[in-house]
């Protein structure tokens, strides 16, 4: 299993329910051959206007909104977010043919100003019985561990970091817990149904102290690479599962 790090790659918001509640299946849309960005609003209680290169693309965007995708030429672009108490601009480089997510979210520190991170979606081919998942930590909490089907497979993922995994298609139970703790989950457990040959981008956001923890998710269809056997997790004795890396988002706000 490979967990790395950001919602409508192309489609809808997926709201998290109470512990044990199913959150799927996720519906996939086709990937585009052109360069594009999708913009995700992940700041609870905020309403923002969004502009790309000075052109307004949305007004009054609320938490959970997934805007786009917006087709862009390769090269440098700027995305700005404005609203009551919010004035954030983020510059990014868009690669040819890339699908890039731009996420407005809160930092780990309570009361911190919103930040923006962006990253390219991993849209490479995948085996017919596999699903690819990207889980990003964009919540107002300390570093967290990720449990999949009751097993801790990623540890110490900080705000602005992510994990990427390829898993067998089907339903998986996912929970976010305080790093190194056996306490109750910060989020979940959630039953997430993943269709074969899809990429699901899942963002954990909000603050468990005020009950605003939730997720935003979107999916896209992937092409097959002919491989049949799903990737499995080779867990290590500490830290991440062997062969897995957790990286910060590609670009900062």
Predicted regions located by residue number:
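Intrinsically disordered, low-complexity polar regions and short flexible loop motifs
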Residues: 12-253
